[in-house]
Amino acid sequence: MLDATLSTVFQPVVDLSTGEPVAYEALSRMQSGDFLIPPHRFFEDARTGGDLLELDADCWATSLATAREQGFRRAHSLLINIEPASFEAGLMLRIPPEQPVVIELTERALLARPGELLAMADAARAAGHAIAVDDLGAHAASLALLPLLDPDIVKLDMRLVQERPSADLARIMGALDAHLAGRDVVVIAEGIETDEHLVTARALGATHGQGWLYSAAMRDVPHAGRLSGVPLRSSHVTSAPLARTPYEVVSARVETKPSHRDLLVQMSVFLEARARTSGDSAVVLATFQESTNISPATFERYAELAADCGLVIAYAKGVSPALLATGARVHEIAEGDPLLEEWDIVVLTADFAAALVARESDPSHHEKGEYRFALTHERALVVEAARSLLADRA
């Protein structure tokens, strides 16, 4: 692709109540002679060839330069995609936009390196940018990951708008409604090409949309400087946890009780089984103190969880080959981390949330197996517990 030319086109994001554009999404195009190279192809070629970060930086810089030439001035009037690796590497900080933009991420970014992504999202918001989750509904895992990022904007995958109603669509609608309840989040539906698509988009809760019913992508944007921008919530409080561990998060709000390790094991098994019923929409985060606490039966259960669920992370001191062999993502607990005294399991799915947190009563007498524990199903508290595990640890 050495002789290919990179350029940017813009597709409008319209207010569904008026049909008027409020913002535009920047889309990268690559042309070699008279041949237009499909975006998925040149990105896949770059990924295979190890040039993804370089290509994404070129796309980012070209989009910002073209938007500046077109006269974009208002905050959040430009939506721009960024690869997870580029976002984590701080591309937007190295080549900063002149005004706050909407940064689009897919749920695979959370699956890849959740801790780093959450930290970068908080940094982006601190700089005035907004975070959008793109292609929501394309993969079931995104439904459980949504509350961890708590985006300002969700973009519904065009499949949800264009395909016939199904049980899967109903499940996604239910999960989306549950997440949006009480939140001032903008919902953008992609792929609106017919009046029927528009009806479906509205039924899904979309307030804004994109698609050929309104306009194809264009090179020149009329009145770019007059765009109002996507209407975001008045403020977004970043949710980086103050507490360092799940036990500290939950025990501050829920009364703790004494328990023996044997009961905690059975409660953990129950929550693990509940996670498996949700399949690839489930997130499971578990701490085991020392890897020597993990029995052969537990290794087997976590191999099954890793095969079935969207994201499974195990935390322990002394990572063993048997734990790595489960297929779960494994993170070692550092010496001195208060997590070494905890037995925790956090489960998040599209329609279920639970956090079982326990702290050893006397770590110097580990053989006694005595803990204080708390169990909560309050989703907001479970999300906070999950973020405390992911922060600086995943």
Segments from the language model and where they lie:
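Anion (oxyanion) recognition and catalysis
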Residues: 125, 181, 202, 306-307
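Bacterial c-di-GMP phosphodiesterase EAL domain
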Residues: 1-97, 259-266
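EAL-type cyclic di-GMP phosphodiesterase domain
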Residues: 31-58, 84-130, 158-178, 195
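Structural preference for beta-strand elements that scaffold enzyme active sites
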Residues: 5-7, 23-25, 75-79, 100-104, ...
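Short loop/helix-cap segments at secondary-structure boundaries that form the rim of catalytic
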Residues: 92-96, 146-149, 201, 320-328
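Non-catalytic regulatory/interaction regions at protein termini and inter-domain linkers
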Residues: 226-394
